[in-house]
Regions:
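Juxtamembrane and boundary regions of transmembrane helices in multi-pass small-molecule transporters
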Residues: 46-47, 111-202, 317-350
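Alpha-helical transmembrane segments of multipass membrane proteins
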Residues: 29, 33, 63, 126-134, ...
Length: 350
């Protein structure tokens, strides 16, 4: 009975902590939809996969979301035609590479500024490498969920319009953007889950460009779309929080902590602990600070770098974009790179 009470308390704390950031991510996703010209966004993204992954990793400075809110924004990037390396880089690095988290880490480790610097450097490096690795997969069908793949197939990123193109191309662009406004925004393709065929003759008269709407109408659409996505993602977040709480209660934490003495085992323990506790990146530095006297600096960095990338609460959200095999590869690559980087620190630096 005591474990049940503890589990319920942890579940509520995770949910209360995560929901505001999920709401922020959904709101940013809606703002991207209605106020960002996706054609210009795609045009400005680097075509080089390595540079694109690096740029995507640094976008977190502009969109300060944690691991609870980065998934909706990364999904919006993908369906707006942003290259996969950019989206992957943002997905993995945004929870760490943002001003709020950097400030919180500096506050916690004021006496160890190298922790702050290395957390940013390692997060950028790992996200860039993984994004670059995924750039070799040209066909996205094996990576993303079928609904995402269908949408990207029927709504390819718009190209700069040439003089020889008529009004049909412009109408298609407007329909492509506003296709996301229908019911089932997050699932894609409306109530039936079927992508809308983009054809100038089939565009309803209500689908007019958002650029022609007044600010009040745009804001109303932003609110409506945010409510729709929050309703669809909230249930997934609740399930993920419940799983994370169950793991925290049932996992033998005393055994895990007792293994944190060696340079290798301490990193493994903190990697496992990062997955188990599923704490938000805005406050995880204070949690890691409590282990500073017993764990090596490399293992603390492993917790601070790997934790925001791999959060149990967000696995359900990621499954709405990627297939399970893709998420496994993301997790495995992130764990291996984090282990190698932090082990080098434990053996040769600290």
């Amino acid at each position: 009975m005591n474990e049940l009470n503890n589990g319920f308390t942890i579940f509520l704390s995770l949910l209360v902590e995560a929901m505001p950031f999920l709401l922020l991510g959904v709101l940013l996703s809606s703002l991207l939809l209605f106020f960002v010209n996706e054609r210009k966004l795609v045009e400005k993204m680097p075509k080089n996969p390595l540079l694109g992954a690096l740029v995507g990793s640094m976008i977190g400075f502009l969109f300060p979301v944690c691991e609870c809110g980065n998934v909706p924004v990364a999904r919006r990037f993908l369906i707006q035609g942003v290259p996969m390396p950019v989206a992957i880089g943002f997905l993995l690095a945004a929870p760490t590479i943002n001003p709020v988290v950097i400030w919180a880490t500096w506050t916690a480790f004021r006496d160890q500024p190298e922790i702050v610097v290395l957390r940013v450097v390692f997060s950028l490096a790992i996200a860039t490498i993984i994004g670059f690795v995924f750039s070799f997969q040209k066909d996205l069908n094996p990576i993303v969920q079928p609904a995402i793949a269908r949408y990207m197939k029927y709504n390819p990123p718009t190209q700069p319009q040439t003089k020889g193109r008529g009004k049909r191309s412009q109408v298609q662009q407007e329909a492509t953007v506003l296709n996301l406004l229908q019911s089932g925004t997050y699932i894609l393709g409306g109530k039936a889950g079927i992508p809308l065929r983009i054809d100038a003759n089939l565009v309803p008269p209500t689908l007019i460009s958002t650029s022609d709407k007044p600010i009040a109408a745009k804001l109303r659409l932003v609110v409506d779309n945010s409510i729709q996505e929050l309703r669809e993602l909230g249930g997934v977040m609740i399930l993920g929080s419940a799983i994370a709480a169950a793991i925290q209660v049932l996992a033998p934490r005393e055994l895990i902590l007792s293994l944190g003495a060696g340079p290798i085992t301490s990193i493994v323990v903190m990697l496992i602990l990062a997955v188990v506790v599923s704490i938000c990146s805005t406050v995880d530095s204070f949690f890691a600070l409590s282990f500073a006297s017993t764990f090596s600096s490399g293992s603390l960095l492993a917790f601070l770098v790997f934790g925001p990338m791999i959060d149990i609460k967000s696995v359900g959200l990621m499954l709405s974009i990627f297939k399970p095999k893709t998420i496994f590869y993301l997790f495995a690559l992130a764990a291996q790179l984090t282990f190698v980087f932090t082990l080098f620190l434990n053996l040769h630096v600290f």
